[in-house]
Design a protein with these regions (language model features):
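N-terminal targeting signals for export/organelle localization
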Residues: 1-68
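Short loop/turn microsegments at loop-to-beta-strand junctions
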Residues: 62, 89, 161-162
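A short beta-strand-turn-helix
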Residues: 65-89
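Hydrophobic beta-strand anchors of alpha/beta hydrolase catalytic cores
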Residues: 90-91, 118
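Aromatic-flanked redox-active Cys/Sec active sites in thiol-based oxidoreductases
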Residues: 92-97, 123
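C-type cytochrome heme c attachment motif
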Residues: 96-103, 163
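Structural microenvironment flanking redox-active thiols in thiol-disulfide oxidoreductases
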Residues: 102-138, 147-154
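Thiol/disulfide oxidoreductase modules built on the thioredoxin-like
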Residues: 136-140, 148-194
């Protein structure tokens, strides 16, 4: 008598079928525990999205071409603008609905006033909302592309907004900041890197 026939007779499923029934529950339980651990880390400060590495560091930006934000009078943004800019530039992904984007905006305005080219990507935002955001908070951007569907953000490996990248004079991504650029970030990280890659 085969194992399957014996299992049918005894009312028990053979091992392979039991495993198929139990395996999804184990996978779901493991994923749930991992998610709970991440949420717990968020509450205690143990989980930091800035610690998520970028696969793009040391590489050229991915190929992309974004249309301009209408009504602002700036050109759009493409990978060609970053191939060899001749000086360090920042690429900043932002959205009008993003509270941390408002927090970091004064730092971007400061960098722009100091002569650092800041290129913007308006991420998953309605054009009218993006325009209102810049009218309200100021416009630090020398170029500004619209990524309404979010495809370019996916290609860049965007974790969320705001997210800022430093591109060196030769067109290589040297630094990434997931989260708002703050005064501390400028002093400790970005400022020294801008001087290094100038």
């Amino acid at each position: 008598m085969s194992v399957a026939q014996e299992g049918r007779r005894s009312g028990r499923l053979p091992f392979s079928r039991r495993a198929l029934l139990v395996l999804p529950a184990l996978v779901a339980g493991g994923a749930g525990l991992g998610f709970f651990a991440m949420l717990r880390g968020l509450g205690t400060g143990g989980y930091d999205p800035r610690g998520v590495p970028s696969a793009l560091i040391g590489k050229a930006p991915p190929d992309f071409e974004l249309p301009p934000l209408e009504g602002i009078g700036l050109p759009g943004l493409s990978a060609a603008d970053l191939k060899a800019p001749g000086r360090p530039v920042l690429v900043n992904f932002f959205a009008s609905w993003c509270v941390p984007c408002v927090i970091e905006h004064p730092q971007l305005m400061r960098l722009s006033r100091e002569g650092v080219p800041v290129f913007g990507v308006n991420y998953k935002d309605q054009p009218a909302d993006g325009r209102r955001f810049l009218e309200r908070h100021g416009n630090p951007y020398a170029r500004l592309g619209v990524d309404l569907p979010g495809r370019t953000a996916i290609d860049w490996g965007l974790y969320g907004v705001p997210e800022t990248y430093l591109i060196d004079r030769g067109g290589v991504i040297r630094w990434r900041m997931a989260g708002p650029v703050t005064e501390d970030t400028l002093r400790a990280d970005l400022g020294p890197l801008l001087r290094r890659y100038a």
